[in-house]
């Protein structure tokens, strides 16, 4: 049998120790494998080696503490030899909405010097179709002494595959283990090797396909979500125009056995749903009309929210605006592509009033929000003329809605509106 399939993967390297990479490394370490985490962020590396975490994810702190103290997990800024390399680095898009693969290229150049015959390289980063093949090409440029799948196919020295993460922030540790995984190797043997690696910790099914299908699968999943969210967001704007409560409307419409409308919000954020559909649009701009339109609807929703805040602010001489929530979804600290950040930043730029922020999951505001105060809920409410709910954190559900009676409330998530409807 091929060595890459027989190999026991005793030593595994995870490149990129963020919201996906660190939990993945930790789960693998819990299977008593030696995990070498690699990140260019020295603070993250030092924090992990002190058995602490630099991100917020339920229960991750306990697992990292155990993995580091037992000697199964350590972090470094420089790659070291391993049997398998999992690349989990960001894949943003450029200003023209084209994919930016510079982080993947940098990861390839970083690990190339320590590769040896029989190693497996898996790209976990959500990527445009063809990125796994490009990764193989970048690796081969650095290591002419080794062969890669795009050169020799099944006979290559190095195995390369794509296995996109498909977890929900706040539930990452459970979903890493329980969710099905899509594994797309550049060759069948690449797929077999990657499948063997993921079966070390995945209890869900490991479904094997080719690399390009695996890449497109993740993009499709997120585009599907984006289109459905766009429907809900557009519906919320229509309901505002015609005087219908969108939260009640969705609640009763979803009583139909074949209708499942999602909940609207202030936009769409995060590093997946707000980004990945553009990879499809970039690949097939003439055909991806619905996907493009959905992105445009969701990208426009923060401006719609801002218009409502502007209208409310005109009622006050010196308005104080309290914004509840900054993260891109509830109960996490991840601010990437957050529509709430865009909304708050624009409020400040347009000088709509004094802007306060309540975000229980962070201790320091991003530098882009200069001039904004970070407060707890009670002092923010005491000072506010206008209250804008941007993220439906669980902690905000406990707020006494009677405190909102004398204030202008813009509830973009329906949390307080739905609570009043149910009362």
Curated annotation (Swiss-Prot):
Query: At the top level of its lineage, which domain of life is listed?
Result: Bacteria
A GO MF annotation of the entry reads: NAD binding
Its EC number(s): 1.1.1.-
Residue positions of the active site: 218 (proton donor/acceptor), 272 (nucleophile)
> Which amino acids does the record list as binding NAD(+)?
11-28
InterPro entries linked: 6-PGluconate_DH-like_C_sf (IPR008927), NAD(P)-bd_dom_sf (IPR036291), UDP-Glc/GDP-Man (IPR017476), UDP-Glc/GDP-Man_DH_C (IPR014027), UDP-Glc/GDP-Man_DH_C_sf (IPR036220), UDP-Glc/GDP-Man_DH_dimer (IPR014026), UDP-Glc/GDP-Man_DH_N (IPR001732), UDP_ManNAc/GlcNAc_DH (IPR028359)
Paired cysteines (S-S): none
Q: Which SUPFAM superfamilies match?
A: 6-phosphogluconate dehydrogenase C-terminal domain-like, NAD(P)-binding Rossmann-fold domains, UDP-glucose/GDP-mannose dehydrogenase C-terminal domain
GO:BP terms for this protein? Answer: lipopolysaccharide biosynthetic process
UniProt KW keywords: Lipopolysaccharide biosynthesis, NAD, Oxidoreductase
Family note: Belongs to the UDP-glucose/GDP-mannose dehydrogenase family.
- Name the job this protein performs: Probably involved in synthesis of sugar components of EPS I, by converting NDP-N-acetyl-D-galactosamine into NDP-N-acetyl-D-galactosaminuronic acid.
Family annotation (NCBIfam families): NDP-sugDHase (TIGR03026), PRK11064.1 (NF008286)
Output this protein's name. NDP-N-acetyl-D-galactosaminuronic acid dehydrogenase
Query: Organism, per UniProt?
Result: Ralstonia solanacearum
């Amino acid at each position: 049998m091929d060595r890459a399939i027989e190999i026991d993967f005793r030593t595994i390297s995870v490149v990129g120790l963020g919201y996906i990479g660190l939990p993945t490394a930790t789960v693998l370490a819990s299977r008593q494998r030696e995990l070498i985490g690699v990140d260019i962020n020295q603070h993250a590396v030092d924090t992990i080696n002190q058995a602490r975490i630099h991100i917020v994810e339920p229960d991750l702190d306990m697992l990292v503490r155990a993995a580091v103290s037992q000697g199964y997990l350590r972090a470094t800024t420089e790659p070291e030899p391993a049997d398998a390399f999992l690349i989990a680095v960001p894949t943003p898009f450029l200003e023209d909405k084209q994919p930016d693969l510079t982080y993947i290229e940098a990861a390839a150049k970083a690990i190339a010097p320590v590769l040896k015959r029989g190693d497996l390289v898996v790209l976990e980063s959500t990527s445009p179709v063809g990125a796994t093949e490009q990764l193989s090409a970048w690796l081969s440029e650095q290591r002419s002494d080794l062969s890669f799948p795009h050169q020799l196919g099944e006979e290559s020295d190095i195995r390369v595959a794509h296995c996109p993460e498909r977890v929900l922030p706040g539930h990452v540790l459970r979903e890493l283990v329980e969710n099905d995984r899509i594994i797309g190797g550049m060759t069948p043997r690449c797929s077999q090797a990657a499948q063997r690696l993921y079966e070390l910790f995945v209890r869900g099914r490991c479904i094997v396909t080719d690399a390009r299908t695996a890449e497109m699968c993740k993009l499709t999943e997120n585009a599907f979500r984006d289109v459905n969210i766009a429907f809900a967001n557009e519906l919320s704007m229509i309901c505002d125009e015609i005087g219908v409560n969108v939260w009640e409307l969705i609640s009763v419409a979803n009583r139909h056995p074949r209708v499942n409308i999602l909940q609207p919000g202030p936009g769409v954020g995060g590093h997946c749903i707000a980004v990945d559909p553009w990879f499809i649009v970039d690949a097939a701009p003439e055909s991806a009309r619905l996907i493009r339109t959905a992105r445009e609807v969701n990208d426009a929703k923060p401006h719609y929210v801002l218009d409502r805040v502007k209208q409310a602010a005109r009622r006050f001489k010196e308005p104080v605006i309290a914004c509840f929530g900054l993260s891109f979804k509830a109960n996490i600290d991840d601010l990437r592509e957050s529509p709430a950040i865009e909304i708050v930043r624009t409020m400040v730029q347009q000088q709509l009033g004094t802007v306060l922020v309540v975000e229980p999951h962070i201790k320091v505001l991003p530098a882009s929000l200069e001039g904004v105060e970070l407060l707890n809920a009670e002092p923010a409410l005491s000072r506010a003329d206008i209250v804008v709910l941007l993220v439906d954190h669980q902690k905000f559900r406990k707020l006494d809605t009677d405190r909102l009676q004398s204030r202008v409330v813009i509830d973009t998530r329906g949390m307080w509106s739905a609570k009043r409807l149910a009362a």
